[in-house]
Amino acid sequence: MTAVHAGNINFKWDPKSLEIRTLAVERLLEPLVTQVTTLVNTNSKGPSNKKRGRSKKAHVLAASVEQATENFLEKGDKIAKESQFLKEELVVAVEDVRKQGDLMKSAAGEFADDPCSSVKRGNMVRAARALLSAVTRLLILADMADVYKLLVQLKVVEDGILKLRNAGNEQDLGIQYKALKPEVDKLNIMAAKRQQELKDVGNRDQMAAARGILQKNVPILYTASQACLQHPDVAAYKANRDLIYKQLQQAVTGISNAAQATASDDAAQHQGGSGGELAYALNNFDKQIIVDPLSFSEERFRPSLEERLESIISGAALMADSSCTRDDRRERIVAECNAVRQALQDLLSEYMGNAGRKERSDALNSAIDKMTKKTRDLRRQLRKAVMDHVSDSFLETNVPLLVLIEAAKNGNEKEVKEYAQVFREHANKLIEVANLACSISNNEEGVKLVRMSASQLEALCPQVINAALALAAKPQSKLAQENMDLFKEQWEKQVRVLTDAVDDITSIDDFLAVSENHILEDVNKCVIALQEKDVDGLDRTAGAIRGRAARVIHVVTSEMDNYEPGVYTEKVLEATKLLSNTVMPRFTEQVEAAVEALSSDPAQPMDENEFIDASRLVYDGIRDIRKAVLMIRTPEELDDSDFETEDFDVRSRTSVQTEDDQLIAGQSARAIMAQLPQEQKAKIAEQVASFQEEKSKLDAEVSKWDDSGNDIIVLAKQMCMIMMEMTDFTRGKGPLKNTSDVISAAKKIAEAGSRMDKLGRTIADHCPDSACKQDLLAYLQRIALYCHQLNICSKVKAEVQNLGGELVVSGVDSAMSLIQAAKNLMNAVVQTVKASYVASTKYQKSQGMASLNLPAVSWKMKAPEKKPLVKREKQDETQTKIKRASQKKHVNPVQALSEFKAMDSI
């Protein structure tokens, strides 16, 4: 390796190396290689018994090689004369090509005269190799001359950056910056050209990233240096200037290394982790488990597969133990890890039983399928865990920054330092989550972009903090405020880049499923905060809901940009507009009204039902968006995305911790109910229609009354909702997935029934009218009876069997019994509500208005309801199947990282 330090330029070149590092050299060399190869292969079968003679074809080929060599010599002479760098080396290389060309001409001519001579063929082959080596060296040398020219320009920029940093006054600073800008632009053009010619993808990415940093940070260095000159007493300005200067030095080194195709240590590490580690390990494991039974050896394969699996489980455990991973998700990941372990042992046992056989048995094939299914389930849980992190962390990403800036504007340095720690933790969390998303992604190009963006965000974090500290020291300084605004803009832009990059490597289906679940959690928290009169909790949680909704709208709208406009995109965008333009404003209005009412002294009454309705509409809006997005998915994709699970489940469908009565052939009982034959589905639909009639009667009855002071109405509504979920289960829909879920729902109904029985008997005890009293007690007995029946019928899975290895779905009788029991209970609840009201009126007439103080039962007519803001979509309309639209557009990291012109205005 030869290092040339002409004018302090670190130029590395090995004159003996013939490694081709650019596409241009390949293109120029290809025609000559083709011609020489064709000539060498002419009559290559060796000596022939045929009459010797001159080969016209060989002579023609020899002439074409000679002409190609002349063309290279002509271009080489021109390059050597015009080149400012490596002139002597180029002249020597041209002469070497000329010399080898003459030898090749002579050897080719002799071979053409006697193409059957192995000696002459050998001479020509050696001459051809020497010629190709000489031409390659000439082209590489010419290429390095271009690199040398780029490095000279890079040195000019490097010196200009140093002068800008060390400027002694503002006038000198302005002069240096004005001189530096055109030099940076010139370097950018040269580096961009070089970038396009580099063969190695890693070098191209390194060049693109370095160019981006250079273009972005030169104007920032000017601003930071200007601030240092105006406020030399503020240490934060100097620290910022030095940080930016260090980044620029790293960018200069990156351009130098990439141009010469010599990767730095950082770049090598970066490139080494270009793919998702966990995703790669899982993919590789799935390939390794398929082995020919004939060559299977337990001693060789068992330790290897177990070691690979434990490595995967270690990575999954790290994700499970991360601070943002929720408890239920952690349990699912642990369960899936145990399931994968068990599946591997079962698979190895089958391999041992099949060892030495030519073909795999059905049992072995089944074990392989089970193994891949378990790894797929683990992947799904890891993806969902990542989406939990993304949904929580990439939410209101500007809040820590705004709080930090506000403290800085007030000149409170102590607060700035406290909020700086919060801001730093927030930045670290974004970077950690981005890396987690990378680990489970198969999108290599997307992973590179995420990691580059995260690296730039990490470098920007201390600069933002220093800018805030500087503003806190000089809060009245206009320059300090402008400096803070500049870094605020840079931070927000970089966070957007990182957010979009993370969105690109994660599944929108997973994102929407997790977001829907998180919004449901937040809606419930909001309602609880309202009932507990927790103003801060209400305001904070409502803000999170607004942030999540805005994020969903942004992600879905961006996703629709990847599709051709049509019915599908119109449907999705219509759902997003409904959420943003109608639902969210109403929710915001209700939140503001609730906060205002609770904050007043004394607290003002408010319509809790209105708030709950507005909150529920937000959840429904998110769910409608998700339904619209999933319209074009195939059944296989829907299965993978867990569509219709509502994410109410608390464990995986294939978890080893799931009891046997919950799973058959790896499917939830609800999924099996969805597979019933059409004839049986029709019977269930008929029963459901009858149930809906009873539900309508209950709706009509409870809608008359204000439930704010009437626990009987509240309990009736709760029982109605749970019964609806149970009937939905029989149709393969709704939040209840397994038999245990239905049993749990039945227990909840029984508990509600017991509470209603207690309230009803209290009313009956005080009722002076014996007839009304007896009616009410009779209806209460019916509720107890039908709750017991419902509890028995809730075990609907009893009729689903696995016979002869095939799934036999015969759950229709149990399903219809369940619906009938729910229908009877619904009717009993309706009659109980009516009888309770009648008994209460008798009690009032006898005892006077004081009876209205009866605990938890106050009969007040409900005010007329407002018209619904959102027209609910029919279920049938959401199930329309259409063909898949165009695939997602490819995001080029080089293009994304090379958009520099936005900074020209600074």
UniProtKB/Swiss-Prot annotation:
<keyword id="KW-1003">Cell membrane</keyword>
<feature type="modified residue" description="Phosphoserine">
    <location>
        <position position="295"/>
    </location>
</feature>
<dbReference type="GO" id="GO:0005915">
    <property type="term" value="C:zonula adherens"/>
</dbReference>
<feature type="cross-link" description="Glycyl lysine isopeptide (Lys-Gly) (interchain with G-Cter in SUMO2)">
    <location>
        <position position="57"/>
    </location>
</feature>
<feature type="region of interest" description="Disordered">
    <location>
        <begin position="864"/>
        <end position="894"/>
    </location>
</feature>
<keyword id="KW-0472">Membrane</keyword>
<dbReference type="GO" id="GO:0001541">
    <property type="term" value="P:ovarian follicle development"/>
</dbReference>
<dbReference type="GO" id="GO:0008584">
    <property type="term" value="P:male gonad development"/>
</dbReference>
<dbReference type="GO" id="GO:0043066">
    <property type="term" value="P:negative regulation of apoptotic process"/>
</dbReference>
<feature type="region of interest" description="Interaction with alpha-actinin">
    <location>
        <begin position="325"/>
        <end position="394"/>
    </location>
</feature>
<dbReference type="GO" id="GO:0015629">
    <property type="term" value="C:actin cytoskeleton"/>
</dbReference>
<dbReference type="GO" id="GO:0045296">
    <property type="term" value="F:cadherin binding"/>
</dbReference>
<protein>
    <recommendedName>
        <fullName>Catenin alpha-1</fullName>
    </recommendedName>
</protein>
<dbReference type="GO" id="GO:0016342">
    <property type="term" value="C:catenin complex"/>
</dbReference>
<feature type="modified residue" description="Phosphothreonine">
    <location>
        <position position="634"/>
    </location>
</feature>
<dbReference type="GO" id="GO:2001241">
    <property type="term" value="P:positive regulation of extrinsic apoptotic signaling pathway in absence of ligand"/>
</dbReference>
<dbReference type="GO" id="GO:0007224">
    <property type="term" value="P:smoothened signaling pathway"/>
</dbReference>
<keyword id="KW-0597">Phosphoprotein</keyword>
<comment type="function">
    <text>Associates with the cytoplasmic domain of a variety of cadherins. The association of catenins to cadherins produces a complex which is linked to the actin filament network, and which seems to be of primary importance for cadherins cell-adhesion properties. Can associate with both E- and N-cadherins. Originally believed to be a stable component of E-cadherin/catenin adhesion complexes and to mediate the linkage of cadherins to the actin cytoskeleton at adherens junctions.</text>
</comment>
<dbReference type="GO" id="GO:0005794">
    <property type="term" value="C:Golgi apparatus"/>
</dbReference>
<dbReference type="GO" id="GO:0007229">
    <property type="term" value="P:integrin-mediated signaling pathway"/>
</dbReference>
<dbReference type="GO" id="GO:0090136">
    <property type="term" value="P:epithelial cell-cell adhesion"/>
</dbReference>
<dbReference type="GO" id="GO:1900181">
    <property type="term" value="P:negative regulation of protein localization to nucleus"/>
</dbReference>
<dbReference type="GO" id="GO:0030027">
    <property type="term" value="C:lamellipodium"/>
</dbReference>
<feature type="modified residue" description="Phosphoserine">
    <location>
        <position position="297"/>
    </location>
</feature>
<dbReference type="GO" id="GO:0006915">
    <property type="term" value="P:apoptotic process"/>
</dbReference>
<dbReference type="GO" id="GO:0071681">
    <property type="term" value="P:cellular response to indole-3-methanol"/>
</dbReference>
<dbReference type="GO" id="GO:0045295">
    <property type="term" value="F:gamma-catenin binding"/>
</dbReference>
<feature type="compositionally biased region" description="Basic and acidic residues">
    <location>
        <begin position="864"/>
        <end position="880"/>
    </location>
</feature>
<dbReference type="GO" id="GO:0043297">
    <property type="term" value="P:apical junction assembly"/>
</dbReference>
<feature type="cross-link" description="Glycyl lysine isopeptide (Lys-Gly) (interchain with G-Cter in SUMO2)">
    <location>
        <position position="797"/>
    </location>
</feature>
<dbReference type="GO" id="GO:0007405">
    <property type="term" value="P:neuroblast proliferation"/>
</dbReference>
<dbReference type="GO" id="GO:0016600">
    <property type="term" value="C:flotillin complex"/>
</dbReference>
<dbReference type="GO" id="GO:0008104">
    <property type="term" value="P:protein localization"/>
</dbReference>
<keyword id="KW-0965">Cell junction</keyword>
<dbReference type="GO" id="GO:0017166">
    <property type="term" value="F:vinculin binding"/>
</dbReference>
<comment type="similarity">
    <text>Belongs to the vinculin/alpha-catenin family.</text>
</comment>
<dbReference type="GO" id="GO:0045880">
    <property type="term" value="P:positive regulation of smoothened signaling pathway"/>
</dbReference>
<feature type="compositionally biased region" description="Basic residues">
    <location>
        <begin position="881"/>
        <end position="891"/>
    </location>
</feature>
<feature type="modified residue" description="Phosphoserine">
    <location>
        <position position="641"/>
    </location>
</feature>
<dbReference type="Pfam" id="PF01044">
    <property type="entry name" value="Vinculin"/>
</dbReference>
<dbReference type="GO" id="GO:0043627">
    <property type="term" value="P:response to estrogen"/>
</dbReference>
